[in-house]
Amino acid sequence: MSRELMVETGGELIGNTPLLKLNKIGKDLGASIAVKVEYMNPACSVKDRIAFNMIDTAEKAGLITPGKTVLIEPTSGNMGIALAYCGKLRGYKVILTMPASMSIERRCLLKAYGAEVILTDPATAVKGAVQRAEELRDVIPNAYILNQFGNPANPEAHYKTTGPEIWRQTQGKVDIVCFGVGSGGTCTGVGRFLKEKNPSVQVFPVEPFESSVINGLPHSPHKIQGMGTGMIPDILDLTLFSEALRVHSDDAIAMAKKLADEESILGGISSGANVCAAVQLAKRPENKGKLIVTTVNSFGERYLSTALYAELRDNAANMKQLNLDDSIKIAKEYLGI
């Protein structure tokens, strides 16, 4: 849907996000890097696309009914927020199961959209949230799990929207895409579309260094919320990929801060991981002159309570009202004068 016209429903606001070249972070790397700014979706993340498509597809198949079906879904946060948003639009009660390690902002946003939140043991990661969702479905009347990790409507959303948008916005000149793997929908859907358009396009999944299950390594705790669930999702099409890239949590956090500082892009930790991976690829000699596209998955405000903004949060909490002299002193220190 064009953003130049008035729309009738909130669902029509989803998609057609801007593609922005990283002029500072991408400078002198050999290849160019551009990001799809997915926090421009109405519920501020890439997951808006799949939540809407999964509900729409299930409705058309007669699997769910507004005002009757209760939607239950395991999530690390952004999918839950998107589903709460789309569920509210379409007339559904929504219950989300989520590891207790996810940020407080996620819980607040879910509640703000009218969803119920059930926290699960963080030690069991997303697998524990999946199990709890299934247990709830079995005892709640008219409950239905859309199952982002196994639902073909997830990658289909990206095949129908994100992939074509990237192709159009780059005028078919995209060479490489890389995306963090949570449910695997972006990598699979975008990769499938672009490879149909140009088989030479390379697709790279991205996972936390600490939880590199696609690379055959064990899952362990990490700080990149929304990625590295500890399992390989059913919808992830491994045949599309050139190589699974690994990004350390601390590097992802540092890059998220760098995005805000140098490019004025306030994204989350997974967005930092995506750009870290893009920088890895841009530095490879064989990619000189190529165009690499990734996503800024979600808006940074929902990460204020995480390790990403720990120092700033402590600073803000300790701020005090100042007199004029101290105000001038602080202002001069900030300006370096």
From Swiss-Prot:
Superkingdom classification of source: Eukaryota
InterPro entries linked: Cys_synth (IPR005856), Cys_Synth/Cystath_Beta-Synth (IPR050214), CysK (IPR005859), P-phosphate_BS (IPR001216), TrpB-like_PALP (IPR001926), TrpB-like_PALP_sf (IPR036052)
UniProt key word Transferase: yes
Binding site for pyridoxal 5'-phosphate: 78, 182-186, 270
Induction description: By hydrogen sulfide or cyanide. By morpholin-4-ium 4-methoxyphenyl (morpholino) phosphinodithioate (GYY4137).
Alphabetical list of Pfam families matching this protein: PALP
Reported function: Primarily catalyzes the formation of cyanoalanine and hydrogen sulfide from cysteine and hydrogen cyanide. Can also catalyze, although less efficiently, the formation of cyanoalanine and hydrogen sulfide from either S-sulfocysteine or O-acetylserine and hydrogen cyanide and the formation of cysteine from either S-sulfocysteine or O-acetylserine and hydrogen sulfide. By catalyzing the assimilation of cyanide produced by P.aeruginosa, mediates resistance to infection. Involved in fertility, growth and aging. Does not mediate survival in high levels of hydrogen sulfide.
Protein name: Bifunctional L-3-cyanoalanine synthase/cysteine synthase
Lineage: Eukaryota, Metazoa, Ecdysozoa, Nematoda, Chromadorea
Originating gene: cysl-2
